[in-house]
Amino acid sequence: GDVQEGEFIAEGGGVR
């Protein structure tokens, strides 16, 4: 996603 935690890069970036 954008500024979320727990999502992968394939989700839309924002791995932090």
Curated annotation (Swiss-Prot):
Keywords: Adaptive immunity, Blood coagulation, Coiled coil, Disulfide bond, Hemostasis, Immunity, Innate immunity, Secreted. GO terms for biological process: adaptive immune response; blood coagulation; innate immune response. Conversion of fibrinogen to fibrin is triggered by thrombin, which cleaves fibrinopeptides A and B from alpha and beta chains, and thus exposes the N-terminal polymerization sites responsible for the formation of the soft clot. The soft clot is converted into the hard clot by factor XIIIA which catalyzes the epsilon-(gamma-glutamyl)lysine cross-linking between gamma chains (stronger) and between alpha chains (weaker) of different monomers. Forms F13A-mediated cross-links between a glutamine and the epsilon-amino group of a lysine residue, forming fibronectin-fibrinogen heteropolymers. It is found in: Secreted. Its main location: secreted. The keyword Acetylation does not apply. It comes from the Eukaryota. One of its GO terms (cellular component) is extracellular region. Signal peptide: none annotated. Cleaved by the protease thrombin to yield monomers which, together with fibrinogen beta (FGB) and fibrinogen gamma (FGG), polymerize to form an insoluble fibrin matrix. Fibrin has a major function in hemostasis as one of the primary components of blood clots. In addition, functions during the early stages of wound repair to stabilize the lesion and guide cell migration during re-epithelialization. Was originally thought to be essential for platelet aggregation, based on in vitro studies using anticoagulated blood. Heterohexamer; disulfide linked. Contains 2 sets of 3 non-identical chains (alpha, beta and gamma). The 2 heterotrimers are in head to head conformation with the N-termini in a small central domain. A long coiled coil structure formed by 3 polypeptide chains connects the central nodule to the C-terminal domains (distal nodules). The long C-terminal ends of the alpha chains fold back, contributing a fourth strand to the coiled coil structure. This is Fibrinogen alpha chain.
